Amino acid sequence: RHIEVFRKKAEEAGKPLPVTINMGLDPAIYIGACFEAPTTPFGYNELGVAGALRQQPVELVQGVAVKEKAIARAEIIIEGELLPGVRVREDQHTNTGHAMPEFPGYCGEANPSLPVIKVKAVTMRNHAILQTLVGPGEEHTTLAGLPTEASIRNAVEEAIPGFLQNVYAHTAGGGKFLGILQVKKRQPSDEGR
């Protein structure tokens, strides 16, 4: 989400945006990466969420081919640059007009103009293990639901302190569209609230 803002800024300056793609990470980093507004505002470092969950900072290392950081314990790291002004169609190999399924499970329209990354280096551990999340699926939507739950909890607690006891962003709603709330009814007017 944030990378698009940085990519546009670099492109406006006519420069490529150096990036690292880190794969095979510990679960805390995947959880932290799911956080978005309004739970974490723009500019918030989601690696801080991961560090808090694991009770130690996420170690970073300097990339070998780009001037950008990478996650030290990643199994596989792809380093490259998002090229300014270079685009491809998302369905360039299928010509179907459709993309991979969206997070709720339906097929969306293919993006006609995606940025291109020029890969500069790939580094990996010996016998690297790649565990990945490709949605839609329960693992993916459960992770997506964590920041949704936190946002709902924060908003309701601010509006009606002590009313919300628990919240679950159900996987049937992709972790975003269906919330189940447990509330503490304190007065007759709370019925049906």
State where each predicted segment sits.
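Internal alpha/beta scaffold segment
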Residues: 1-35
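Charged, compositionally biased interaction regions
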Residues: 25-193
